Amino acid sequence: MSKTNKLALLPVMLCFFAMGFVDLVGIASNYVKDDLHLTDATANVFPSLVFFWFLIFSVPTGMLMNKIGRKKTVLVSLIITLFSLLLPVFGESYGLMLVSFSLLGIGNALMQTSLNPLVATVMKGGNFASTLTFGQFVKAIASFMAPYLAMWGAQASIPAFGLGWRVLFPIYLVIGILATLLLFSTPIEEEPIEGKASSFMQCLSLLGKPIVLLSFLGIMCHVGIDVGTNTTAPKILMERLGMTLNDAAFATSLYFIFRTLGCLTGSFFL
């Protein structure tokens, strides 16, 4: 890999870290439920809403990426993510959190769709699989940090500036701004798209291929396990063992710690 590609890989890996911001929705929904005294059904709207936008925006994002390029699409996703992280700093009302989590889901849908192709552009065919797996390792670091940051903020173990558990939003906001600036300032040469871009229906028709359909179902199950563990693990410990939310928050981090180790190990195998 050339020196230029190595320099471009740093902001791309930081974008993977920003991709992990979406996993804060699990612990955040538990804290919002506790603060606003919501029912389980009402609180579960938050994680469902975040990942609902994957269904809506994944295919259109691919079409957008063909028009404006991979790097610009990732930058758009980062800007939307920054707005989603900024809103909770100003309050914790139900409506505000709905808008924040919706923007977080939209930004992450754009990022998930465009970041992997950007890695392919940077790597130019070299160690692509292991680089993607290492990127998932970086993403998982952000995922397991979120519950600890929220817990430390709620317990005032770190300066929370009156935000309590919501201090994780400005912390991730600063990292997101850094990722945006680094990616914007890093020159990445993208090859021009040859031929006609695929239409919406042509993209959906790929599900008619068994391997694509099975991969789609596998990813859906994987995301379901992620979201389910992320959201319900603290609830189960609170209900069965009588733990407080601050004490039970470690369950989500424990899951992501082992996922982080798995991604790191996988990057070496690949």
Regions found by a protein language model. Give the residues of each.
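Cytoplasmic helix-loop-helix junction between adjacent transmembrane helices
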Residues: 100-137
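Helix-loop-helix hairpin linking two adjacent transmembrane segments in secondary transporters
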Residues: 126, 131-187
